[in-house]
Amino acid sequence: YLMGRELEVDGVFDGEDILIPGIMEHVERSGIHSGDSISVYPPLHISEEHKKTILEDTKNMARELGVVGLINAQYILYNDEIYVIEVNPRSSRTIPYISKVTGVPIVEVATRVILGEKLKDMEFGTGLYPEASYYAVKMPVFSFEKLTDVDIAMGPEMKSTGECLGIAKTYPQALLKAFKGANMKVPKKGGRI
């Protein structure tokens, strides 16, 4: 187990080039299932150097795994080092989220790649897609009030039953919208959520 900041990417690899629409940063501590984590795009706490490392590492893993199409990778940033914690040569639950918030139709792009097109010949380019000028927060939704025998402690097993999305010009506004979308009561002053 590594403490640190968890990061996640979805990408498309065509055998030569990769397109990563965006890097998502998890808000909670590492070790929480990614489906149960609050996630923010664009990431708040990583350097351009770390973004380049994630881009190159994801590209290299896709090449070594023989991926043509979608890839999902999860990382931890700990003591200024990037560590791979999981890589999946497939789609993930974050594909609709990152597609919506970046405007990159990832499934369509991956399908075109699988059918033989090259990323460099498409309108979205290669590498890390330019970041948006707004923030998007993916918020898990839980049903603990209906599933009363479920342990509510967060860990590596997913417990959420849905997700919602908050989008705004600032991170605090996007986070507030996401909390409201998940029907969480947010105090106007002080308190805890």
Predicted regions and their residues:
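ATP-dependent carboxylate activation and anion-phosphoryl transfer catalytic cores
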Residues: 1-191
